[in-house]
């Protein structure tokens, strides 16, 4: 079989999953028979290869069954593509460059320093509705059983009796670059709604590539994800930006609608863009859908008000 072609297909599917492109799911279903054929050949190479394949492939099927986007993306782009690369080297002496993983040597995270820097950032913001965010973070218990974070800052949330990743566990910064590609294609975005903060890598990338006058609304449906990020990821460079506004469910989410009305203009209505972080559309679909409907309604009201001539 053409394993190089299979590699290219799976690599592209992995990228699409990181980009939140739902066409990847159909493409993955279509390539599964070809992948099955490859597996039947790969397990015969060596006992080590057999153990790896029999560990990874069931993980992929379980991820697909649960529509677990980031686990599927990590499994396809890193684990299965790596298996194919090793197979090619062993069987055909052809070299395929392995996908770069994050440098795990930099796992010494000073959570106290990061946390205080983030809290300092919140205090310096002129918006009063950030005060609740600081209070919540200072009272948050990092041993909470519904959220997990490892020594590298990878975050997973417990929902529907299973753990869901909110960022790539192999190279979240690299995955964030994939996620930003669609944003880069837009001629201009005056207002960007980002639903879900993940581990802030994607947010940091998006905040860098949009014009400085673009209003960025960030909505996080789970306050525990925000709290954990406050200890493990320095997000002060993002939140301190003049046109970046942060809203967290249960803390200051009601301000999202008000700020939408206050800051929206006709140009923002015409050039607004919604980005939903991978996985969030699956595990927080109801919360995000509700906020999108509310924001759309407020945008229409803002446009109507802006175009109304007082008699």
Spans of features found by a protein language model:
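Short terminal alpha-helical segments
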Residues: 1-38
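Alpha-solenoid helical-repeat scaffolds
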Residues: 3, 47-50
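Residue-level signal for cytosolic alpha-helical hairpin/rod architecture
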Residues: 10, 57-58
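N-terminal donor/sugar-recognition subdomains of glycan-related enzymes
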Residues: 19-20, 26, 33, 40, ...
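Short helix-adjacent coil turns
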Residues: 19-23, 64-72
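Short, charged, amphipathic alpha-helical segments
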Residues: 26-30, 72-78
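Long, low-complexity or tandemly repetitive, helically biased scaffold regions used
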Residues: 43-44, 58, 62-68
């Amino acid at each position: 079989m053409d394993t190089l072609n299979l590699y290219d297909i799976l690599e592209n599917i992995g990228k699409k999953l990181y980009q939140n492109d739902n066409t990847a799911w159909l493409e993955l279903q279509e390539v599964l028979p070809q992948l099955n054929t490859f597996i039947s050949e790969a397990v015969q190479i060596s006992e080590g290869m057999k153990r790896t394949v029999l560990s990874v492939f069931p993980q992929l099927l379980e991820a697909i069954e649960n529509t677990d986007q980031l686990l599927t993306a990590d499994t396809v782009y890193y684990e299965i593509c790596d298996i194919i690369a090793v197979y090619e080297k062993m069987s055909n002496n052809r070299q395929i460059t392995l996908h770069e993983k994050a440098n795990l040597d930099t796992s010494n995270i000073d959570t106290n320093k990061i946390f205080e820097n983030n809290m300092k950032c919140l205090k310096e913001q002129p918006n009063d509705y950030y005060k609740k965010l600081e209070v919540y973070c200072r009272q948050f218990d990092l041993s909470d059983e519904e959220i997990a974070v490892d020594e590298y800052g990878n975050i997973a949330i417990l929902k529907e009796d299973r753990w869901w990743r909110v960022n790539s566990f192999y190279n979240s910064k690299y995955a964030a670059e994939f996620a930003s590609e669609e944003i880069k294609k837009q001629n201009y975005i005056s207002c960007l709604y980002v639903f879900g903060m993940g581990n802030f890598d994607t947010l940091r990338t998006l905040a860098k590539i949009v014009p400085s006058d673009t209003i960025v609304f960030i909505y996080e449906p789970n306050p525990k994800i925000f709290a954990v990020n406050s200890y493990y990821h320095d997000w002060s460079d993002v939140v301190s930006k003049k046109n970046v506004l942060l809203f967290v469910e249960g803390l200051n989410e009601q301000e999202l609608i008000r700020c939408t009305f206050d800051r929206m203009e006709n140009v923002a209505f015409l050039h607004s863009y919604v980005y939903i972080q991978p996985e969030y559309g699956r595990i927080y679909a109801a919360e995000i859908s509700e906020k999108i409907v509310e924001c759309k309604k407020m945008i229409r009201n803002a446009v109507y008000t802006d175009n109304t001539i007082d008699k």
